[in-house]
Amino acid sequence: MIDPTARAWAYLSRVAEPPCAQLAALVRCVGPVEAADRVRRGQVGNELAQHTGARREIDRAADDLELLMRRGGRLITPDDDEWPVLAFAAFSGAGARARPCGHSPLVLWALGPARLDEVAPRAAAVVGTRAATAYGEHVAADLAAGLAERDVAVVSGGAYGIDGAAHRAALDSEGITVAVLAGGFDIPYPAGHSALLHRIAQHGVLFTEYPPGVRPARHRFLTRNRLVAAVARAAVVVEAGLRSGAANTAAWARALGRVVAAVPGPVTSSASAGCHTLLRHGAELVTRADDIVEFVGHIGELAGDEPRPGAALDVLSEAERQVYEALPGRGAATIDEIAVGSGLLPAQVLGPLAILEVAGLAECRDGRWRILRAGAGQAAAKGAAARLV
């Protein structure tokens, strides 16, 4: 028998075109089962009704979950340990919120043995044009193989050209590669990459926010790109024209606070024009895998052995500082209490709290959060980083 909570999540993943901030807010407020019931009965606000009205009577959740289980997959929700909390925390930042669709996914449909929570802290996106040149495919393969050899996961979109070259090289080097799809996991796209996507699902991880049967479309590719950027620490554009999906992924990476990098190419090549534009606007120049590894390193490697608390506070975002200042000087506080003190919604404090924990500035015990002082903070930061890498 299918778990009612899983069935509710599966129903909700189909009822609105993702990402739907209003639907996510309802789920945070009342939980997935109650949210699904309200949506199904049409007992939601006008704004959410506009997003769900056309599909609320479509319930394929049981069939969707059975298909997922037959394929050996899993539904990853924000309640699961595998949910990449730190990676998706970036969607609470101002850069993401300023962009259309700048929201965390509701759920993820995933196939493959690699866990997202373990992969994302040490991953790099290698992306580029479908109409790649021999030069571009050679460089993409060389970079991906080098990353795989250095235990860095390679994230891409499964497309022809640069994406495919990166995925194949990572697999051939016995590394981990991640494919983020713009449609249901049961619709291999492009069809010519069916075998490649199958290999990724066997040895890495393939995931999508779209339920089975949903076909890729142009707007879904652009929406998907935010997840390619989110689950990587850096986005490297190998080849791209002036108007390309890879440039869109780079824009998402910048909005999410990730490192944006590009590979230079011949000045006469239109396939490198987008890369040269990125480089002119401050992207890091990449020519070898070691350049990317410097951007990606383990979280625990980003700080010195003895970080100064003052310096750590200096680099906090506005939301992270609000949450830090809402923590009590003595004792501990619940998520709801921190939300009240910071002026943020409960869901908006989760990402900043994860950042504070990794930075050794806060810790959670028995569901309550407290400030950490310098000595304890260093030990806690190492423990938090160890759980993430």
From Swiss-Prot:
Homology family: Belongs to the DprA/Smf family.
SUPFAM superfamilies per UniProt: MCP/YpsA-like
Encoding gene, per UniProt annotation: dprA
Expression induction: Induced when cells are grown in human macrophages (THP-1 macrophage cell line).
Gene3D superfamilies membership: 3.40.50.450, Winged helix-like DNA-binding domain superfamily/Winged helix DNA-binding domain
Function: May help load RecA onto ssDNA.
Gene Ontology terms describing biological process: DNA-mediated transformation
The name this protein goes by in its record: Putative DNA processing protein DprA
Domain of life: Bacteria
Coiled coil (UniProt feature): none
Any matching Pfam family: DprA_WH
